[in-house]
């Protein structure tokens, strides 16, 4: 999706992209860059018609959307699988991602089994060959400790403040919000002020926002640790609109801007590959 598709995926376009080689269709609830939820119900109907599995990436919003009847997802929407990250808004240790299957008939497709290994019969139910038991125990303990009521309350507050931030920002001249986010992430840009100038202003007030590309924008994730301070975001943006335009760019914004303008993305990939070589060199 792009900034001009506030209504989310163009369903008719999806129909034409499904072929005999399509193994799965993936939808987001919500997507990471803009916090927008795909039209999962309609996508599910198409997947049913074409007999293609539908996976929903709910890693970012799984612990938020499921407590709001207007945006929650369900396997009844012709969904085959759902991914959720408890280590995000479940607040458990990193590395506790979940893959939920509609039924046991589908699940064996993720198994790895070899019967003729010299070390014996080897089987794993997931990509990691083994899992640390303490990770599973800690995840379970924290979920039980926080409790269902905590997650319901957290979800309600985050959705409420995300909608408030959206309604406040769209009133600010020259500042544009991408789509109409209603979960926990919001992305914005300016049709007048360079992104670098906006970033500098936020950093002066100890806010570090993530830089997105295609299109270039900033996004913020609303959490229990910052929702009480979201008025600062609108205050900073209001202050920016009183400034003169400054066109200098520096830091990450320069890198992202350069990468977006390079037509051959293979070059970008090679540069990043060299960077990873340097950072992992012994």
Walk through the language-model features, giving the residues of each:
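Conserved short loop/turn motifs at secondary-structure junctions
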Residues: 28-33, 184-188, 219-220
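Active-site-proximal loop/turn and secondary-structure-junction residues that shape catalytic pockets
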Residues: 31, 60-62, 88, 215, ...
């Amino acid at each position: 999706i792009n900034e001009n598709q506030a209504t989310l995926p163009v369903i008719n376009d999806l129909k034409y992209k499904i072929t005999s080689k399509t193994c799965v269709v993936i939808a987001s609830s919500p997507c990471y860059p803009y916090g927008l939820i795909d039209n999962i119900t309609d996508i599910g109907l198409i997947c049913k018609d074409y007999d293609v599995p539908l996976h929903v990436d709910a890693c970012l919003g799984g612990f938020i959307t499921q407590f709001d009847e207007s945006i929650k997802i369900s396997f009844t929407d012709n969904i085959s699988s759902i991914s959720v990250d408890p280590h995000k808004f479940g607040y458990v240790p990193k590395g506790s991602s979940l893959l939920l299957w509609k039924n046991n008939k589908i699940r064996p497709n993720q198994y790895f089994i070899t019967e003729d290994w010299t070390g014996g019969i080897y089987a794993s139910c997931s990509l990691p060959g083994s899992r640390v038991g303490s990770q599973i125990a800690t995840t379970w303990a924290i979920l039980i400790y926080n409790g269902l009521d905590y997650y319901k309350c957290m979800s309600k507050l985050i959705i409420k403040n995300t909608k408030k931030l959206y309604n406040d920002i769209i009133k600010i001249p020259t500042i544009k919000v991408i789509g109409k986010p209603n979960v926990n992430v919001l992305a914005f840009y300016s049709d007048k002020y360079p992104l670098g100038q906006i970033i500098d202003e936020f950093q002066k007030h100890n806010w570090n926002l993530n830089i997105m590309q295609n299109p270039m924008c900033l996004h913020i994730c609303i959490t229990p640790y910052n929702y009480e301070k979201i008025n600062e975001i609108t205050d900073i943006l209001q202050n920016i609109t009183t400034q003169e335009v400054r066109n200098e760019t520096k830091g990450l914004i320069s890198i992202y801007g350069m990468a977006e303008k390079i037509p051959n993305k293979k070059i970008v990939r090679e540069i990043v590959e060299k960077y990873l070589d340097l950072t992992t060199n012994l």
